[in-house]
Amino acid sequence: MISQLRIYTINRGMMDSWLKLFHEHLKPNHEKYGIRINASWVNEERTEFIWVRSFDTVGDIQAKEAEYYSSPERIALGVQPQTHIAKTEVRIVEPTAP
């Protein structure tokens, strides 16, 4: 298994609407297209949204993302996700134990 640690800096005043968008649309659609969401957090200042999503292999990332981003559900969201996010950091991480 391979995971992505994703850290989004959310635009000021938009965290509540981001969380609603994430939980009502983004998370279910990721999971529908085979991208597992392991956990999500908000930092103490409520400026960063941190989440982990997982794939079976590194090779699955590109294929699963292409399927997700071209889905009718994601297309219908338009630029809503991008309007919330000021900065994105993505790190590929692997478990240290089986």
What residue spans do the PLM features occupy?
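Residues within well-ordered alpha-helical secondary structure of globular protein domains
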Residues: L21-E24, E67-S70, Q80-T83
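Hydrophobic small-molecule pocket/channel-lining residues, especially in calycin-type beta-barrels
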Residues: N11, L26, P72-L77
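Short amphipathic alpha-helical segments
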Residues: M14-N38
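Short, structured motif recognition centered on aromatic/hydrophobic residues
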Residues: I2-R6, W18, N29-H30, F49-V52
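Absolute protein N-terminus
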Residues: M1-I2, P98
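Glycine-rich beta-strand-turn "strand-cap" elements at beta-sheet edges
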Residues: Y33-I50, D56, E73-P98
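Short beta-strand-to-loop capping motifs
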Residues: Y8-I10, R53-T57
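Short amphipathic alpha-helices within nucleic acid-binding modules
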Residues: D16-W18, T57-Y68
